[in-house]
């Protein structure tokens, strides 16, 4: 029994840091690299992880060093771990070179060490490896941790109670095949100033594992919920959500249309990512559609919904129907 290491990242960062680790520590056995490229979807990444694990011995424990908490590599590694409860796996995010070197060191120094001990040592070393020069730029460590006290209402709020103005605030509504992942957690959530993420999907609401992964992928200070479309429609009309500022995530434009037709007030829909599949045409490098998708967007347009085609907030807005026309979807 040993420890197999998977280095995982958005783009080719994992390949580069693997090469850097080899320059410093020499070539290592039982190391696999998983990269998530712009033209790939979650299922591609899921397959990459499963292929990587198959390269290790059946009794090897698995250590995943991923780039970003709540990013797609983390999410798919969590999915694989959840589907293999008998296989010891640990996932550490914040990938840097000190982390990788320490992982190699831990394996070399104590071949019998369990993955729990190895992970604890790696986390400490990867944090200690972040330093600044001049030294006075380094933050002073607090002697006692600052604890936030959150006052929450105990028990259910009675139906009919009006909070604030009684209207759910939809700060951002987005179509994204990947739902809650790194770009949404680290870019769109703060940009939208949302205090709650609502994933509205009948499919995901019935999948306990995916619900768990989405909840743990939420950024600090923001709650994530997974609900069927009907529950989103109910919540949009419930005065108890008057102080909620929500980021709504739809897996498909069809789900967004159902919500709007059910009375959810969405004035603008951010179209961020639609994964490619058989029968669909690439509209740009992250959007893939078929005639049904186009018809759905046309219905949304007829319901006075406008569209913001951007993968991340810093992108310039694109015109959805100009992209569709150029793609010549048949």
UniProtKB/Swiss-Prot annotation:
GO terms for cellular component: cytoplasm; plasma membrane. It is an enzyme of class 2 (transferase). The keyword Metal-binding does not apply. Keywords: Cell membrane, Cytoplasm, Kinase, Membrane, Phosphoprotein, Phosphotransferase system, Sugar transport, Transferase, Transport. It catalyses: D-mannose(out) + N(pros)-phospho-L-histidyl-[protein] = D-mannose 6-phosphate(in) + L-histidyl-[protein]. InterPro entries: Bacterial_PTS_sugar_comp, PTS_EIIA_man-typ, PTS_EIIA_man-typ_sf, PTS_IIA_man, PTS_IIB_sorbose-sp, PTS_IIB_sorbose-sp_sf. The modification Phosphohistidine is found at residues 10, 181. Transmembrane segments: none annotated. The record marks 91 as: Involved in the phosphoryl transfer between H-10 and H-175. CDD domains: PTS_IIA_man, PTS_IIB_man. Residues 2-130 form the PTS EIIA type-4 domain. Residues 166-330 form the PTS EIIB type-4 domain. GO terms for molecular function: kinase activity; protein-N(PI)-phosphohistidine-sugar phosphotransferase activity. One of its GO terms (biological process) is phosphoenolpyruvate-dependent sugar phosphotransferase system. The active site is at residues 10, 181. Its EC number is 2.7.1.191. It is found in: Cytoplasm; Cell membrane. Its main location: cytoplasm. Residues 143-161 are annotated as: Hinge. The PTS EIIA type-4 domain is phosphorylated by phospho-HPr on a histidyl residue. Then, it transfers the phosphoryl group to the PTS EIIB type-4 domain. PANTHER family: PTS PERMEASE-RELATED-RELATED, PTS SYSTEM MANNOSE-SPECIFIC EIIAB COMPONENT-RELATED. The phosphoenolpyruvate-dependent sugar phosphotransferase system (sugar PTS), a major carbohydrate active transport system, catalyzes the phosphorylation of incoming sugar substrates concomitantly with their translocation across the cell membrane. The enzyme II ManXYZ PTS system is involved in mannose transport. Homodimer. This is PTS system mannose-specific EIIAB component. It comes from Streptococcus pyogenes serotype M6 (strain ATCC BAA-946 / MGAS10394).
């Amino acid at each position: 029994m040993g420890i197999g290491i998977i280095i995982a990242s958005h783009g080719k960062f994992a390949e580069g840091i693997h090469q850097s680790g080899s320059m410093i520590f020499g070539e290592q056995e039982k190391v696999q690299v998983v990269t998530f490229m712009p033209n790939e979807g979650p299922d591609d990444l899921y397959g990459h992880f499963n292929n990587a694990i198959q390269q290790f011995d059946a009794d090897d424990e698995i250590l995943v060093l991923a780039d970003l908490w709540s990013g797609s590599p983390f999410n798919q590694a969590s999915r694989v771990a959840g589907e293999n409860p008998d296989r010891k796996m640990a996932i550490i995010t914040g990938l840097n070179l000190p982390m990788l070197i320490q992982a190699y060191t831990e394996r070399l120094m104590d071949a019998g060490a369990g993955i729990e001990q190895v992970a604890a040592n790696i986390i400490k070393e990867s944090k200690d490896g972040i330093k600044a020069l001049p030294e006075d730029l380094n933050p002073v460590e607090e002697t006692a941790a600052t604890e936030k006290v959150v006052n929450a209402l105990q028990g259910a709020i009675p139906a009919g109670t009006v909070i604030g103005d009684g209207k759910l605030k939809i700060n951002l509504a987005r179509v994204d095949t990947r739902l809650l992942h790194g770009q949404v957690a680290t870019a769109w959530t703060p940009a939208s100033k949302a205090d709650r993420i609502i994933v509205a999907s009948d499919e995901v609401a019935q999948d306990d594992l995916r619900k768990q992964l989405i909840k743990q992928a939420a950024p600090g200070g923001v709650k994530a919920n997974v609900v069927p479309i009907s529950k989103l429609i109910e919540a949009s009309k419930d005065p108890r959500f008057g102080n909620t500022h929500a980021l709504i995530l739809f897996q498909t434009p069809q789900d967004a249309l159902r919500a709007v037709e059910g009375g959810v007030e969405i004035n603008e829909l951010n179209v961020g990512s639609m994964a490619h599949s058989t029968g669909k045409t690439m509209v740009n490098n992250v959007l893939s559609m078929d005639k049904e998708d186009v018809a759905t967007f046309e219905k949304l347009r007829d319901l006075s919904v406008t569209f913001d085609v951007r993968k991340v907030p810093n992108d310039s807005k694109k015109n959805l129907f100009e992209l569709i026309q150029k793609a010549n979807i048949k």
